[in-house]
Amino acid sequence: MELLTILISSLLGVVAPVGVVIDQTAENAIRSQFSTVEQLQVRVDNAPSYQLLQGKVERVLIAGRSLQLKQQDFRIAVLELETDQIEFDPSSLKQNLPKFKQPLQAGVRLVVTEQDLNKLLQSPQFLNGLRKLNKGNSSAFQFAGASNFANPKVEFLPNNRFSFQVELQNDQEVIPLLIKINSGLSIVGGRQFQLVDPEVSLDGQEFPAEFLNLIISNINQQLDLRNLEGDGLQMRILKWKMKPGKLEIAAFLRLEPSSKFLETRR
C-alpha cells in the first residue's frame, strides 16, 4: 500500500505550494518521496504556460531507476509514469493539497526484482502484517495456533509462475512447519488476479483438495482490484510478465477527486 501512496504523492508533488510547476520543482518533490534514488527524470508539459495559472497541466512524465522506499526495505528497479491532463483548483494550493476538478488518470510501469521483493518479505513490517492477517482471518486460510511466520521466500518461474515458501512456527512445535506454494498467476479482465493450477504442501504433504479450494477462493477474493473502487480508485492491469529474476507490471490508474488516497499528503 505504501507504493500506491507514493505513486499518488508523486502526482500531487508536481504541483508546488506556490502554484508554479517546473521540471526541477516537480523532480525535487518526487525525489523527496524516496530515501535514495539512482536516477530520476521528470518532464512537465505545460503549454501554453498561462494554463498553469488556471489550474491545468497538460501531462507529467516520470522515469526513475533504483528507487528505495522510505518506510519499507524495498527498492523499485524501474518506475515509469505518464499522466493525462491534470486539472485542479488553484486556490486549493494554499492548503498544500490540490483539489482536483476531474479524475486523475495515469499509466504506470514497474519492474521489481526477485531479490528486492524477498528483502521486503523478510522485513519485520511484512511479517507483522502477515501475522495480523492470519489472526484476523476466520476462514480456512487461518492456521490455528500459529504464533509466527518466518523466512518467507519467493522465486519467479517461467510462464508467469512462482513458488513461495514460509515457515510456520507455534508454541507446540520445536521444528517449524514449512508451507510451500507453487502456482501460476493470471489476470482476468485486467482487474482480478487468480492463482492458476496451485500446488500447496505442508511439510511435504499436499493439502486436501477441498481445503485447498477454500484457501484459493479466499486468496482470489483478496486479490480483486475492484475492492479499491469503494475508495475512489480504479486500477486495470495492462501487462503482467513474470520471469526468472524479475516481475514487470503495467497498469492504468484512475482516481476520483473524492478518493481517500488523495488525502495522503494531509
Give residue spans per PLM region.
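Hydrophobic membrane-targeting and insertion signals
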Residues: 1-74, 255-266
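Short helix-loop boundary/capping segments
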Residues: 135, 148, 160-210
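Short, surface-exposed charged micro-motifs
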Residues: 151-153, 182-184, 237-239
